[in-house]
UniProtKB/Swiss-Prot annotation:
Domain of life, per lineage: Bacteria
InterPro entries tied to this protein: Gp18_domIII_N, Phage_sheath-like_beta, Phage_sheath_subtilisin, Tail_sheath_C
Pfam family for this entry, one: Phage_sheath_1C
Name of the protein in question: Uncharacterized protein YqbK
Primary gene name: yqbK
Family to which this protein belongs: Belongs to the myoviridae tail sheath protein family.
Amino acid sequence: MNGGTFTPGKEKERAGIYFNFKTTAENRVSAGERGTVALPIASSWGEVKKFISISSIEDLNKKVGLNIDDPSLLLLREAMKKANTVLLYRLTEGLRASADISEGVKATALYGGTKGNDIIISITENVIDSSKVDVTTYLDQSEVDKQTVSKAEELKPNKYVTFTGKGDLTVTIPLTGTAPEDVSGALPATSGIRLSGGTDKTPTNADYTAFLEAAETEYFDTIALPVEDNEQLKATFVAFIKRLRDNQGQKVQGVLSNYKGDHEGIINVTGGVLLEDGTEITPEKATAWVAGASAGATFNQSLTFVEYEGAVDVLNRIDNDEIVERLSNGEFLFTYDSRDKSVSVEKDINSLTSLTAEKNKMFQKNKIVRVLDAINNDLTSQLKALIKSRKASGSDVPATNDGLQFVKTLITQYLSVLQDNEGITDFDSENDITIALNNDRDGFLIDLAVQPVDAAEKFYFNVEVK
């Protein structure tokens, strides 16, 4: 099913749900339920060019095989401070580390990257059966796999290495003569054979383009582009977001740094922060936190004044006049409060600066954009569910009065929930929802009027369901 922006008098060929947002006065809107951010990273380990859903440290350990404190996962850590779920995408990989662990037997890291150089293979005599050996895989000197075998060909791949070769396995000789393994499962520093030759690879524009192409079929609320000086890639990213929002009806927000996107779907981060451990989160790195925080914003929440967890200062303190100027340019900034030594969001705005009658200054506020996006995405989802359920029962939603009532009931239920939770006000299902058949009589034209709690007037929606 297709989505996008519906232009009155211009019907679209592909079946779908089309929204045309118009604002007639000042308004403010609260956020709906959200929480998923798509994030590309250049990590030193993991499967490449595939989205992996991470909602907890346990997810990370199980699905990626790294600890959350791994240096290459800085952006993930920042995003997870506020996001519910991170769709992690490793952009590229370098060479895979390897080592000969016995004559004619090789262990090779499962993935390319420098993390493979932290893998150690230890071969010890099995204490129960001296005809067998224990082949133990360690990562960062912690045991992650152990196999008891008689021959090399019995070895099976694990989450970290693959084995090739045949024949007997020679017990590892500790360099200092100490025991190769203790009962705790930790590897003495002088034992085992360390893999080597693993390298990282710098992502190219093609890698980021592949990321965007893959993201097109994923569901997320925000998506980050954590790159510094690459105007071409940033322009591609902005075009990607506009296409998703305006042509496909997927109302997401993109977060990048130091780029004048001039669009409500683009957040332009130009400030950075200093973490308590001394790590500098430059603007391009801060896109991960902003995307995570924007995705995880709760119902009726603005990020204005929300603290940046773990930050102790901003990278560049600026005076009031410069803050005002940069805000007018659509820049997302952080501010340092010397009174309580905290760092927080200066103002939750996007990059829109060219205002029109249809997109006034209220569209510069991410809080308002989030609720508009939530209404679009949620109603699209619910209308799809209605259509699918009818088809599952062997029929379609009829282009009749019964069909009109089906759709009206669905929308009424949804907007009533928003009103009950103080997201909108003065909702009148009799006067705020108008449904009619389209010109071809194969779908519905829906007019909606919605007034946010703190808005002076109502937003008007034109929706087509075919």
